[in-house]
């Protein structure tokens, strides 16, 4: 019997904060107070979030932004795609990406992009399988 999942946008700050235990599976050093501050700031800049649910449990999520860059035109950026460790390799990542890509197309985006941590080899394989290409390097400098 195939497991049934539902996918929907997570729209309230309260619900976005409630998924913190799932979010730290990808970002284990993130602290709740810091997340709360960052989330408020991100929401002011157009941040949105979508989740995949097994019953009432959020088992996968991704944030995303819509913006425009000179080299890409209007684009969607996937941010912190996280699948619960107990639910990986069950098609949840594809559900998230397909939903976000459809929403981005609806909003006139021509490109999807994302960053994946260098050590996230499984994620790299997944994104390549989904048609993403390696386009460059993402540099980070702490200020």
Predicted regions and their residues:
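Conserved GNAT acetyl-CoA-binding A-motif
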Residues: 97, 104-115
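Conserved beta-strand in the GNAT
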Residues: 51, 57-66, 82
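Conserved active-site alpha-helix within GNAT-family acetyltransferase domains
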Residues: 94, 106, 118-136, 141
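Conserved acetyl-CoA-binding loop-helix of GNAT-fold acetyltransferases
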Residues: 83, 89-102, 129
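Glycine-rich phosphate/pyrophosphate-binding loop shared by adenosine-nucleotide-utilizing enzymes
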Residues: 5, 56-61, 76
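A conserved beta-turn-beta hairpin within the catalytic core of GNAT-like acetyltransferases
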Residues: 67-78, 88, 134-135
